[in-house]
Each structure stands twice: as C-alpha cells, then as structure tokens.
A protein has these predicted regions:
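A positively charged, amphipathic N-terminal helix/segment that binds anionic biomolecules
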Residues: 1-101
Length: 101
C-alpha cells in the first residue's frame, strides 16, 4: 500500500504544478467572446465579457481586421486551457478521495 500511496502522492503534486501552470496561462489570455455588430452596412467586432455583474462590450475594430482574428485565436486558446483545467481539477479530486480511503 505504501507504493500506491507514493505514486498517488507524486501524481497529486504533478497535477497541482500543472494546475498552477494552466491558471497562469489562462490569466494572460482574454476571456469573453467576439460579437459582430453592423452599423451603416459595415461589420464591427466587439469583445464581450463580464466584469463584476455587468456585461462589457469593448470595441476591437473592423470585423475583417487581423486584430480580430488574432483575438479569436487567443480566446479559443483560453477556452481550451479552461477545459483542461477543469479536467485536472476533477482528477485531483479523484486522487484526493483515493488517498483518504
């Protein structure tokens, strides 16, 4: 049983390091989504996100600009990281339960 406890402890510490790494990565990326609004037959992009209890729309630029596509990639990266972070947290809870038994 000592070997199993050791392996689970090592996996727990590895997952905690990975969790902090993912949290740092997610903190550096924008959250929210891009919404397109049409004014005078011209599409404009806005970054829409929540701050506190309010919904904020921040102007990015023309919908076809490179800044919009770059921001879209960053938002996609953040969503992927957050999904991975949820999986890591679930695995940590599972390991914690195994160590308690």
């Amino acid at each position: 049983m000592a070997v199993l406890d050791y392996v689970l402890g090592e996996e727990r510490s590895r997952l905690k390091r990975y969790q902090s790494h993912l949290e740092e990565d997610a903190a550096g990326l924008p959250k929210g989504s891009i919404s397109i609004k049409i004014k005078s037959n011209h599409p404009y992009a806005y970054l829409t996100f929540r701050e506190g209890g309010r919904v904020i729309s921040k102007y990015i630029g023309h919908a076809e600009s490179p800044a919009v596509s770059e921001l879209s990639v960053k938002i996609g990266d953040r969503r992927r990281i957050v999904k991975e972070l949820q999986a890591v947290k679930a695995e940590l809870r599972r390991i914690e339960r195994m160590l308690r038994v």
